[in-house]
Amino acid sequence: CRFLLVGEQGRGDEIQFIRFAEWLYQQGAIVDVLVSEPIAGIAASMKGVRSVLASMPPGPYDYWSHMLRMPERMNLDLLMLPIVMPYIAASPHKIDYWREQIDVVSQATEPKKSRRIGVVWAGGPHTALDRFRSVNIETLKPLFSHPGTTWFSVQKGEHECDSEGLADQFDLHTLGPFIEDFTDTLAILETLDLLITVDTSVAHLAGAANLPVWVLLPAYAEWRWLTGRTDSLWYPSMRLFRQRELGEWKSVVDEVRVALTAWCGIKTTQLAAPM
């Protein structure tokens, strides 16, 4: 059968729920997806998608559904997650391009055997709950000072240049102004060791590609992250760090810093004092 899967809501929602195109493909459907323009490039990388559309096609289709109605239509339960993984991928030529660019910008400062970490600290400012999920970049300074790490901002939007003001203090490189779309961001993430981000579309991007990602969540987190968990059923490569008190990020950053120590294999006594 011919099936049209229609994106809706935010970009993160589209990235999260476009996975159902793969499920439909596994059931034997010929699947086209209608998504917002920023998502089109990564949607085109999916095995189960025949065509990626930016405007409503004339048809004909046997069936269609909005993405967020698919869980109901397929009787989804938590045991079925994550459905398929990974379901998006960066193009090899873009990965090669960005690996070369990152090598060039970091070679002067990056210490030997340093871990390369991407960072995003702010979501779209027009989202209703953005004031709860986004942080000031200054809040993350204790992470940037962690030994054995080199940082790359993949922040986009009005805050994409905030990191430039910290470049003289930390091994922190600003890539946002050079990123054209999600295919660039995904290729960059493929070259890094880890992404640390607040709850944004880039968190979904890394998770959908099954890349290591740590997400800082507000106490008032969205339904998709469930409650009381440090993992995500939607994204096996994701680790969640939750606020205990709404608006209080220090304890979250402290927890992430401790996790970085373990992840980097550095003894606590070797750590520089948080700033």
Which residue ranges define each predicted feature?
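Catalytic machinery of carbohydrate-active enzymes
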Residues: 1-275
